Amino acid sequence: MRLDHYLFLNGWKDKKECKRLIQTRKIIIDGEVEYNLSRNVDPQMHEIIVNQQQLTTFGHHYFMMNKAAGVLSANKDEHLPTYRDLVEEKNDALYPVGRLDFLTTGLLFITDNGPLGIDMLKPQQHVSKTYFVETWEPLEVSDRAAFEAGLEFIGGVRTQPAQLEILDVHHAKVAIQEGKYHQVKKMFLALGKKVEQLQRLSFGPLVLDEDLQPGAYRPLTQQEILSLKPYMRK
């Protein structure tokens, strides 16, 4: 959350008082004097000291879900089940960062840290996403070079270079750093291959917990939360 909002939650209700803390160098974050009230902070990732007192309350919430097929990556829907139906936490601010298609399974990152989610989806962040893919048509060695060169969709849209690891004739792992609509499926379709199964294995530094059953979720560990720190806006 923004530093000024975090200060508000911790008792500094007056904006002028918050500015005075900045001007008098009373706010220290990770050992450095902070001058930006709009920066994104979380006491689970940062050491926040105000007036020589460390603040540790009001952190954000972070979860990992193994999304099942047939579940929407949406907060609500009148007709179809959504990931939110499976989350017990009563927190309206939670949302999925980087949605998955209705039939796509795997890692879904859920948080109420809006600025973090926005920043992780920006192209300049180059957040890598890894997928397991099963195709109907057989894969070919030449497909690897095509992915590395970038592929062109109908309409002239071209992808950035991607990494394709062929596991066997019908299975592969794909790593991309973009988030175009139905991108992975369209990349294979550009090579004349239909994707039969798609599972996200990783999103940035987060890796799908193999112990999570489809539809299950858990809070991120402290180590996983800290791995997100490079994406926090300063």
Q: Residue spans of the language-model regions?
A:
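Basic, flexible Lys/Arg- and Gly-enriched helix-loop patches that mediate nucleic-acid binding at interfaces
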Residues: M1-K234
